[in-house]
């Protein structure tokens, strides 16, 4: 029995190591190549389309970093991760606050996630909230910070984050909401998109707002006022 248990544990450990080696190699390749999609994109496409993947899809259009408005970069940093350029992928104080909140609730309800942590989750992981997934998120976060500079991390984030139902990335979002390229977003438009990030489906379609109470207009105003102090990595 113990030998069988040891075999199972060994196989599981080998699988974890192999998976992380794949993540490590994939992220290293993104110094040169752009990721075609993310785990979250693929899951959403399956949710929206089911088996009809030939004629159904998501709106995702990759654009280079310099073709994304500086207004949007500042708005996202001001909203999601004010210390993005200075931390090493995670912020201990925010994670400790999230830990205390989770202990009070008895399960994972908050993650204290930086932009890099959000990117790690979206690229490779499921949307489930549990401590094992959070641990893997931290490992992938380290990999992203090891291989990629801050500008590249922000570029991939802005091109892969969800901004509505089936809408992914800055270019698709700019066209979807404002009928203009991401390079031409104004301060107000950028602030509105950044305000949508915690609940992008709700921002896009009211039917997703049943259990969400967010004043997107008020939040966008706050973000716009903070954009001037946001530090960009370029």
UniProtKB/Swiss-Prot annotation:
GO molecular function: pentosyltransferase activity; peptidoglycan glycosyltransferase activity
UniProt topology in membrane: Single-pass membrane protein
InterPro entries in the cross-refs: Glyco_trans_51 (IPR001264), Lysozyme-like_dom_sf (IPR023346), PBP_transglycosylase (IPR036950), Pep_trsgly (IPR011812)
Alphabetical keyword list: Cell inner membrane, Cell membrane, Cell shape, Cell wall biogenesis/degradation, Glycosyltransferase, Membrane, Peptidoglycan synthesis, Transferase, Transmembrane, Transmembrane helix
Annotated TM spans: 8-28
Principal location class: membrane
Entry's EC annotation: 2.4.99.28
Any Pfam family hit: Transgly
Any one annotated GO CC term: peptidoglycan-based cell wall
Pathway(s) per entry: Cell wall biogenesis; peptidoglycan biosynthesis
Subcellular location: Cell inner membrane
Family of this protein: Belongs to the glycosyltransferase 51 family.
Described function: Peptidoglycan polymerase that catalyzes glycan chain elongation from lipid-linked precursors.
Protein name in UniProt: Biosynthetic peptidoglycan transglycosylase
Organism: Ralstonia nicotianae (strain ATCC BAA-1114 / GMI1000) (Ralstonia solanacearum)
């Amino acid at each position: 029995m113990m030998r069988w248990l040891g075999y199972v544990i060994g196989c599981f450990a080998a699988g974890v190591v192999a998976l992380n080696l794949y993540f490590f190699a994939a992220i290293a390749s993104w110094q040169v190549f752009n990721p075609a999609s993310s785990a979250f994109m693929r899951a959403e496409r399956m949710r929206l389309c089911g088996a009809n993947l030939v004629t159904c899809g998501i709106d995702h259009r990759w654009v280079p970093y310099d073709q994304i408005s500086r207004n949007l970069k500042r708005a996202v940093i001001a909203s999601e991760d004010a210390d993005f350029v200075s931390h090493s992928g995670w912020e201990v104080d925010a994670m400790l606050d999230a830990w205390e909140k989770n202990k009070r609730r008895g399960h994972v309800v908050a993650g204290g996630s930086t932009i890099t942590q959000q990117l790690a989750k979206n690229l490779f992981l499921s949307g489930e909230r549990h401590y094992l997934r959070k641990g893997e998120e931290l490992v992938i976060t380290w990999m992203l910070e090891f291989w990629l500079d801050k500008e590249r991390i922000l570029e991939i984030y802005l091109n892969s984050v969800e901004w509505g139902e089936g809408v992914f990335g800055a270019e698709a979002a700019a066209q979807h909401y404002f009928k203009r390229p991401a390079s031409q977003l104004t301060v107000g438009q950028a602030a509105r998109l950044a305000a949508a990030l915690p609940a992008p489906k709700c921002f896009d379609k009211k039917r997703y707002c049943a259990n969400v109470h967010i004043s997107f207009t008020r939040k966008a105003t706050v973000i716009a006022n903070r954009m001037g102090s946001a530090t960009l990595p370029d």
